[in-house]
Every structure is written in structure tokens, then in C-alpha cells.
């Protein structure tokens, strides 16, 4: 692997050209833009390894003179044992290449990756500033609540900002000092061959500061445990598996960082009569064979406030036929109208007949005509045709 080829630059490229090419390729292959893509992850590590060497004048001179396995390359060459296999190292190189653009609350990554850079710890927050953890709760709704929308009150446990120290963790301003070991950065940088390795400062735990006079209420944590009631407005049309995001209702952040979020996961109970399919409702309607033959008008249940609607069943309807009632289904959760009520007709054959009923049916059978049963007649015609062909 030639580092110049990896970055797509010539051997006489200036530091600015090398940096420009690296930044373009690193953004292209960054894992946040290519989730689950092993080839992109490999390329991201390769361009980071190449930039780590070519961006340093001393390493570049040694590489130009001796190649990857030069006398200053370390035990496994410039890339260590088998190259830059650690994604953390590659990401650190990436952050270093963009310099001050990580400031302003991570705005660079929010613009580049839609905020996904936070998953790799790329927020531009001060040392020790940690966003509060997000919380998740599950809520079960009745079928009717999901259809009409409802407000629920939830009891949520977590952490809130200490009101005594306002989240600083110290009893007074004088009770906080800059960490002497890391000089406020929260990290200790060590050189390993040609690479620089950063690790969390053991003195301050990565916060960049040391509390000498802790707050008595939160014991220096800046947060205290808390339980609170949260009102959640559930929109009409939700379904099982959906979730609602309530920004800022999670645990309080530390050292000025924002609070986490609250995720409400929805589960909807089954209904004894209706079945849901998207925004449509399915109702199984059993009817007798007389009603199926003669037709009828039937009051059927709905989820609307009226509770019932009148359905016309045409004469001669067959079992399995679906009748549509417009705009009597579930409301769309995004406010785009309602679904339909789909009534699936099931013609029930009578059972446990008395002798009188059986006799009436036998008399009826003597009056049957072929046009009364078009499917039956069509089937018999097919059978006749089949045996005629077979005989030939």
C-alpha cells in the first residue's frame, strides 16, 4: 500500500493538498455515512493511516526515504501491527484533521452526518461535559385510545440537575480548579512510535477539572436522583412498535451538557372485533345463507364517536366478499386522512336443523335452476369437458 496512492496525491504534493485530499476521502468513507459497510471502514482506516504519516514532516521524510518499514516506523511499520486496525485511532486522526471545526457544540458533524457524529464522541463540548442518558419507557394503549389519541401520565425515574450547585458539583466557584495533570483537556497524550495516543486523564476522570469543595447536596456529582410525572400526548393513529421522542426529558447532563431524551415505546392491545391493517380496519361479518341470498341491511360497529353505521349487503353475496365503508378506519398518525372499514362477509351454513327445516330445504332444492349457482354450473361444465377430452 502506497500512502500517496491511497490519498490520490503525487509525491510532491504540498501539506495543504494532502490535507484537502484526506478530508475529502475521510468524509466519503466515514463509518457514520456508511453504517455496516466493512469495505468503507477499511478504506477509512487506510486513508487515516496514510494521512497520519504524510501529514507529519518527520514521518513523511522517513517514509519517502525508507518506505513503510523505515527505521523510525516502529515494530509493525508505520501502520503498526497490520496497519491502523483500531477505529478509535482512525477517528482521532479524523478529528485532528478538522481542527477547530469541532467547536460550537458539534455543528460541523451535525451538518455533515446529521448529528450522528455524537455516537463516536465527536461533540465539541468542553472536557467532562457529558450529555445526559436517554431514557425509554413502554406504554400500553387500548385499541380505542390508539384510534382517538390520548394523554397519559408517566412516572419517570432518573437524574435531575442539582438545584443547590446548579450542576457544577461544587459548593462554590472557588471549589473548582483546573486539573494540573491534563491542564484542563481531560486527556493524557502519549507517543507510541510515530503515533500519538490519547487516553482519559486518571486524575480528573476526563472532566478537565477537580472539585476541591464538593456540594453537600449532590456530593460533587452535579445531579441527584429524582422521580417525576411526565404528561405524554399520544397522537391518534399510533400503532404497536412506534415510539415518541420527548427531547430533554431524559437524565440531566453533566458540566453544562444538555439533558438526554425520553423515548416512549407504544404497544396497542388487540381488539375483540376489529383487526388493523395499516390504516384500514377489518371486520368479520357472519351472516346466514338466507340473508346472503336475499340481501339485507345491517348495523355494524365502528370506532367513530357514532359507534355504529348501516351497511347494505347485496343479494347473492358470496362468502369472502369484502365490502368497503369509506373513511371508517384508523386515522393516519401523520394527519393524512383516515383508512377504510373493510367488512369481510362470511356466509354461515346452518347446523342442527330440525326435520321441518330439512324438509323445507329439500323442497327448495327441487326449484333450483342452473342460473342460481353460476359457479357450480361452471365447475360441472369444466368436469364434462375434462372427461370428454380424456375419452378421446
Curated annotation (Swiss-Prot):
Compartments where found: Cytoplasm
Keywords in alphabetical order: Chaperone, Cytoplasm, DNA replication, Metal-binding, Repeat, Stress response, Zinc, Zinc-finger
Domain of life from the UniProt record: Bacteria
GO cellular component: cytoplasm
Principal place of residence: cytoplasm
Ranges in coiled-coil conformation: none
Alphabetical GO biological process terms: chaperone cofactor-dependent protein refolding; DNA replication; protein refolding; response to heat
Cofactor annotation comment: Binds 2 Zn(2+) ions per monomer.
CXXCXGXG motif repeat ranges per the UniProt record: 162-169, 179-186, 201-208, 215-222
Source organism of the structure: Chlamydia caviae (strain ATCC VR-813 / DSM 19441 / 03DC25 / GPIC)
Protein name per UniProt: Chaperone protein DnaJ
Residues the record lists as binding Zn(2+) 1: 162, 165, 215, 218
The family this protein is said to belong to: Belongs to the DnaJ family.
GO molecular function annotation: ATP binding; heat shock protein binding; unfolded protein binding; zinc ion binding
Chain positions recorded as Zn(2+) 2 binding sites: 179, 182, 201, 204
Oligomer and partners: Homodimer.
Zn finger spans (CR-type): 149-227
Pfam families: DnaJ (PF00226), DnaJ_C (PF01556), DnaJ_CXXCXGXG (PF00684)
Entry remark concerning the domains of this protein: The J domain is necessary and sufficient to stimulate DnaK ATPase activity. Zinc center 1 plays an important role in the autonomous, DnaK-independent chaperone activity of DnaJ. Zinc center 2 is essential for interaction with DnaK and for DnaJ activity.
Role played: Participates actively in the response to hyperosmotic and heat shock by preventing the aggregation of stress-denatured proteins and by disaggregating proteins, also in an autonomous, DnaK-independent fashion. Unfolded proteins bind initially to DnaJ; upon interaction with the DnaJ-bound protein, DnaK hydrolyzes its bound ATP, resulting in the formation of a stable complex. GrpE releases ADP from DnaK; ATP binding to DnaK triggers the release of the substrate protein, thus completing the reaction cycle.
Annotated ranges, domain J: 2-67
PROSITE patterns: DNAJ_1, DNAJ_2, ZF_CR
Required cofactor names: Zn(2+)
Gene3D superfamilies: DnaJ domain (1.10.287.110), Heat shock protein DnaJ, cysteine-rich domain (2.10.230.10), Urease metallochaperone UreE, N-terminal domain (2.60.260.20)
